[in-house]
Each structure stands twice: as structure tokens, then as C-alpha cells.
Amino acid sequence: MNSREIRQSFLDFFAGKEHRIVRSAPVIPAEDPTLLFTNAGMNQFKDVFLGKGTREYTRAADTQKCIRASGKHNDLEDVGRDTYHHTFFEMLGNWSFGDYYKKEAIGWAWELMTEVWKLPKERLYATVYHDDEESFKLWQSETDIEHSHILKFGDKDNFWEMGETGPCGPCSEIHIDLTPDGSGGPLVNVGDHRVIELWNLVFIQYDRQADGTLVPLPQKHVDTGMGFERVAAVLQGKSSNYDSDVFAPLFDRITELTGTVYTASLDSPSDIAMRVIADHCRTLTFALSDGAMPGNEGRGYVLRRILRRAVRYAGTLGCHEPIIYKMVEVLVRTMGDVFPELEKQQATVEKIIRAEEESFLVTLGRGTEIFNEVVADMKTAGSTTISGADAFKLYDTFGFPLDLTRLMAAEVGLGIDEAGFEHCMMEQKTRARMDRKGKMQMQDDGGEWQWFAPEAPTTFVGYDMLETEATLVAARVSGDKLLMVLDQTPFYAESGGQVGDHGTLETAGYRLDVTDTRKDGEQIVHVVTSAHDKVRDCAVTPADVSFDGVVSVKAAVDRDRRVATERNHTATHLLHAALRKVLGEHVQQKGSLVTPERLRFDFSHFSKVSAEELEQVEHEVNAEIRKAASVTKHADVPYEEALALGALAFFGDKYADRVRVVEVPGISIELCGGTHVGNIGQIGMVKIVSESSVAAGIRRIEAVTGAAAEALLWQEYRDLQEIKNLLKLKADEEAGPKIKELLEEKKALDKQLQESRLAGLLDRLAASLAGGEEVNGCRIMTERLDGVSGDELRQAAVALRERVPCAVGLLCGVADGKVSLVAFASDEAVKSLKLDAGKLVKEAAASVKGGGGGKLELATAGGKEPAGIDKAIEVFVASVKSALQ
């Protein structure tokens, strides 16, 4: 049977047993943001097992897409080195929700294995939990398995638990003996690849309490799982999952792309590389098809690690250009009918993978050079361990995940100081945290809180009103500010990217200007920066404000600022929806800043957003604004209910049990605690100001709305009119063609000037061409040329190395206070005399307190110390002579 027939026969078998054949859940668990990836078939039924959900059916079966590349289920570093580890796999499974139980589950499993798939009964073993006498007896009575092949094991092997508490129960596993002589009974559950588990039947019958006791469940469930790749290999008579027809098309494609042929060897480096690439391509394709994106944290970073491992392994096959994206079509062709999302998302997935490959290949070469330098230093010093600092530099500067550096180190017989790496990582996180704290935390150099009422959470009433009467709860001076807490307030405290409200607080004696509002736990803190004494009718410093007894406060939010902020906040929701519509559903919000003046929106995307795409996004947003739909706010919605409504929720975001949902019907629905307009028509219009990169895979759009957008358009119109006037264009003439013509003229003139300057520079170097010391037939040329840019020195060096058959030289100069060094070596000097311009310039650069490097024939360096140039020349000449001896 081929793999397609095996998968279908499983589903057909259980359809014949009155099971609902359900679709695989996405590998990105949409309703469980705490889980990185779907890693088992039961994930989509977790709510049923927990008693929180139901289904319209009581029997189900499917083939579930799974990824295990993080947490306790992490097979990443084992992939490629054995016959069975994968980061992506399919899990065939059947379930009973309070319907059939052990008798049917065991009987049907045996029927499928032995009667449908014709596996040899004498090679099969069944394991049961040592206290599960019911299952033990059912194996004897409901199947014709050899009774000596029914084995008992303990908690580690045959008791399943969802967590420390909750649903659990005994399980029964079916193993197959693949030893040549069928003597593998003693190898069951010892981790020997010759006797492997095929199917796990879990019988969920208990609820584990916090004290460890087991309470019987009112309903008993069945949850089974069988690795599709493993059973395909067994049924096809293969000793490795990778030798089945599941992987054969991928290996064929790798051979087409690299010229390397797969030989099914466990030890061959090229075969290991091909297994890794095939596995990782599957993981990436399925994850991206389900909406994941490579990134710098969470599941995004797991995917980026996987992709970079694949790219590096492709390099070991001699391929140093993007190829992983070219394998996606193989999966679409071989699995697209089973998983239609592959074909639907093919173009997007290919673009994402290609962009990631191209990005990493830029740094991979330089990072590998640094790694090789570190290895050379380690071996010279007699060390066998790469320092944590060096490993962290490769991670932080060149994007090498630690597991990639660990792999490369192992290939040359070195280890890594992983504790040192973690120390460097923690230091960086601490610095970042302190930096954020320094930027965000209010000054804390004042006195203690003065309390006027019992401490309690502040009630926020600002969704419904902008003014209210309140009572002062506490106050404190902090530097030149006064911090005030009220029992209730209409002031929105900064959170979720939306800045805090401004406004006034008025008491019987003071009018206080609030210029920021922050959260402190469950309390809202109003930051007062100026005050007016109403009794004396004069300005006072916030520190001079004093209160006595019960203080009534009239709190009033600056209406214009709030309304402008609301326009921009609702606009971010519309922008998010438009980006997902135009660019694809892989787009996810990664951050935002909403102020009265403008909005900033960070989102996941694999490449620069083109001008045409930005125009389309802006058009989509403004078209919706013109429809003037009402904005609906759903308050205090249970989290699960919000997800059922279709609200967007992403991994890594923390949500309360009850949430607020902001909906623009038919356009956008998001979990959001911010303030919004009542009707999107109030936004007026949105104008995108800029699009830029924030980090790898993260883009940023800045935009303005309403009056600010109108003002921007008028300014752009005035600028255009001024340009047309300067160019003496008629009203109906376009400025673009004329500007392009002028730029082309300027480019030609710049080129003439550059050629003229280079010719003059070479004339100045004529003496060096004629002179210069010769050693072993190689002329050594050095010259200092102040006032000449590094780029001009480089052009001169290129010209010089082509004019002298065998020469090596160093050109130095100081321009704008910066030292530039350019070393060159002619082809003859490189090939015959083994001179290395990169090494020579690096040694010379130390004299000017700088560094650099480059290729064998041409290299550059910079420095901070002009006084060291003469010394740099001496070092260069000495290094050349030493190399030529």
C-alpha cells in the first residue's frame, strides 16, 4: 500500500464504525494561545475531555497535523540522525466521547492492524497499565494475540495524564517486533528502534485532584494516536520512516536542486542533511499555511530556527542560494488534496520562506567566518569549549540559533558553554527590561502616598463619559509631579498601545492639569504637572498642593485629545483588517502606538510592502470609512465566547477570563480594552505616512487620520505645486518625468566627476607605481592620501591591482576625521604567493584603533586614531615581508 492508501484505509475503517471523519485542526491552535503548536490529535478535543465543551457526534476519527519542536515535546535536534524523529508528522486517531470504551477500542485496533493491514500477529505486542486488569483481560478475550505478548508496565509507559491535574487514565500500546528473528519481546519499551510503538490507546476515566487522588469521571472517553509516517514505513517494509514514499518525492526534489543523491545511510552527512531539509520543509510549509510567521519570539522564533537549520544544512550540500521554498510545490502536489490549505496558501508560503532564506544567507556567510575564527582561536589555545559570549555574539549579531551553533561546534569536535550563553542572554534581557523601565516608569523620588480613603481598585467609567464627580483616594509628590488616585475616573490609563488621557482635575481649592494617566496595579494614577490655586488665583507647583479630609474631585478628560485618539485607535483595527485582506492572513499585530496626533502599527510580514499594496490597503480602509458603519463594543465577554465570535487572539498575548470585544461588523473583530469612535465615519480618512522595517519579519506603518490627514494632503499638494513652479511646468504636466530626466543628467555628471577624480588620484599615485620595494618579485606599495574618501581609495586600489602583475599595497587616508585603510593584492600575489589582503588590513588596522577585513584580493578597514597611520603602514609592510619569506 502506498501512503495515500494507508491514510485513506484508516479513515474508511473508522467511517465504517460510525465515526465522524473530521478535518485536521490547524497546527496553530487558534483557541489555545498558551500552546505553541498542535502536538497531538486530541488537542482539538481538549475542551470535551475537560468537560467544557461538547460535539454533535460521539465518535470521531481524523489525521491530525502535528508539530513537536518546542517544550517537552521537542524532537528538533534528533531529526535526521535516526530513522523516526520528525518535527512535523501526521497522527492518525479515533475518539469516543462517552460512547464506546475499552472493548471496542482494543478490538477495532486489532482488526485494523491484522485483518485490514495484514500485519503479522506473531510480531505484535500489547502493553497495558499494571493495574488495568480490564484491558489485560480484553486483550485476551477480544483478540487472538498470543497471551505471552500482553505485557504490563507502570506509570511511565502506560498511564496518560493531560497535566498535573485533570483528565487522565491508563493506556494500552501496540508495538511491532522488527528484529530479523522475531526475538524482540524483551525490547518492548526500552527505546530500541527494532521494536517500536505503533498505536497508543488512551482510556480517559479519572480526574486527577490537586492532592494526587483519582476521582472517576462521570463519562469515560477514548483517545488514540498512531504516527502515520511510522506505520507507513512498517506497512511498506522499510526500516526507516524516511525510506517510505512519504519522503521520496522530497528527496527527489532535493536531488534536482543540489545534485546530491539520497542513499538511506544513517551516518552519511549528506543523507542527514537531506533528512533534515525534508523534515523542516514539511514543518515550515504546514505551519505557514496555517497562518504562522517566522519571528523573534514564541512560535515565530521556533520556525525561524527550523528554517535556518535547513538553510545551513543545504549549505553542506554545496547549495548557497534559496532552495527550501522550491520544495513547497512537492508538498502541494503530494498532500494538497488531503490538506487543501497547502494549495490555497502556496504562493504566500513560498514568498515567506524565500524571503527568510535570502535574509539569513546574507549573514550566514559572515557568521560562518566568525565561527571559523573562533574555532581557530579555541584550537590554538587548546580549548574544547566555545565561550558563551562567542555563542551569544553569533546568535545576537548573525542570527545563529544556539542549536545551530551547537551543531556546527559538534562537527569540529567542540562544545559550547551553554551556561555562559544563558548568562549573556539574561544580561541582555535585563538591560532591555531596565531600558523599558527607565523609559516608562514615573519618577519615584518623592514622598509616601497620603491616603484619604481605603485603598481599592479604581473604577474606569471613561467608556461612557468624559466627565465625572469622584473622590480622592490617595496623592503623592514625585519629583516635579503630583500623582493622584481617585475612586473612579473617566481618564484612560496608558495600555494596549493607547496613550493615557490628558485633562483636568478640579477640587474646591485647585485646578490641576493632568498630562498623563498610568496604571499601577489595579489603580489608575493621574499625573499632574501644573496647578492653579483657585483661592489665591495663582499658579503653584504640584508639590505645593495639599489636601485635607474628604476631597471631592471633578475629573474632566480633554475631549479633543480623546476623540482624536479614538479615531486613530479604531483606524488601527481597520488597518489590521485591510492588511490581512491585502497581504494575507499571516499578518498579525506585533505592537502599536495610538496617540492623538498619529498611529503606529507593527505587524508580521516577510517583505517590504510595495507602494501598490500600500495604496490598496489605504483604499480598503477609506472605502470602509465612507460606509460609516457603527462600532460595537461587547463588554465582559467570556474569553472562549469571544473566540467563538471570531475575535483575533494571538500566541503570547495574555487575556483575562472575561474580555472586551470591539467589532466593526463584517470588517474587524478584536479583543481590545481601548477607547473607540462610535461610528467609523468619524475617522474621516486615513493617510499612510510611512512603511518601514522594525526587525526581521516585522514591518511598521505610520499613519494619520481626520484633520491631520487632510493637513498632510494639503502640504503635499503645496509641495508639488512648488516643484512644478520650479520646473516651469504647466498645470496639466506631470513632475515625475522631468525630475527623472534631471536625475539622469545629474547621474551622468557625477560619473564624469568621479572618473576625473579617480584619474587625478591615480596620477598622484604614479610614483608608487614606478617605485616601491620588491620582495620575491612582488612590489609592495603604500601611500597616504588625506582628504580622499574610503570609497575613492577602494576604486584606486582596484585600478592599481589590475595595473601591476604582482603587487600588494595599502592605501590610507583621513577624511572627516575618520581613518580609512584599503589593502589590495594582485591575482598573481594571491595565487602564487598566498597573500591575504583581508588578514593584512586587519593586522594594520589595530594601529589606528580599528578593525576590518574582506576578501583575499581586496579588503577595507576603518579606525579612530589618525596618528597611528604611519604605524599601520609599518605593520603592513612587515606583515607582507613576513608572509613572503
Curated annotation (Swiss-Prot):
Binds 1 zinc ion per subunit. It holds the Pfam family tRNA-synt_2c. Keywords: Aminoacyl-tRNA synthetase, ATP-binding, Cytoplasm, Ligase, Metal-binding, Nucleotide-binding, Protein biosynthesis, RNA-binding, tRNA-binding, Zinc. One of its GO terms (cellular component) is cytoplasm. It catalyses: tRNA(Ala) + L-alanine + ATP = L-alanyl-tRNA(Ala) + AMP + diphosphate. Zn(2+) binds at H569, H573, C672, H676. The keyword Aminoacyl-tRNA synthetase applies. GO terms for biological process: alanyl-tRNA aminoacylation. Gene3D superfamilies: 2.40.30.130, 3.10.310.40, 3.30.54.20, Bira Bifunctional Protein, Domain 2, Threonyl-trna Synthetase, Chain A, domain 2. It is found in: Cytoplasm. It is an enzyme of class 6 (ligase). The keyword Cell membrane does not apply. Its cofactor is Zn(2+). Its EC number is 6.1.1.7. InterPro entries: aa-tRNA-synth_II/BPL/LPL, Ala-tRNA-lgiase_IIc, Ala-tRNA-ligase_IIc_anticod-bd, Ala-tRNA-synth_IIc_core, Ala-tRNA-synth_IIc_N, Ala-tRNA_ligase, Ala_tRNA_ligase_euk/bac, DHHA1_dom. GO terms for molecular function: alanine-tRNA ligase activity; aminoacyl-tRNA deacylase activity; ATP binding; tRNA binding; zinc ion binding. Its main location: cytoplasm. Consists of three domains; the N-terminal catalytic domain, the editing domain and the C-terminal C-Ala domain. The editing domain removes incorrectly charged amino acids, while the C-Ala domain, along with tRNA(Ala), serves as a bridge to cooperatively bring together the editing and aminoacylation centers thus stimulating deacylation of misacylated tRNAs. HAMAP family: Ala_tRNA_synth_B (MF_00036_B). Belongs to the class-II aminoacyl-tRNA synthetase family. Catalyzes the attachment of alanine to tRNA(Ala) in a two-step reaction: alanine is first activated by ATP to form Ala-AMP and then transferred to the acceptor end of tRNA(Ala). Also edits incorrectly charged Ser-tRNA(Ala) and Gly-tRNA(Ala) via its editing domain. This is Alanine--tRNA ligase. The lineage of its organism: Bacteria, Pseudomonadati, Chlorobiota, Chlorobiia, Chlorobiales.
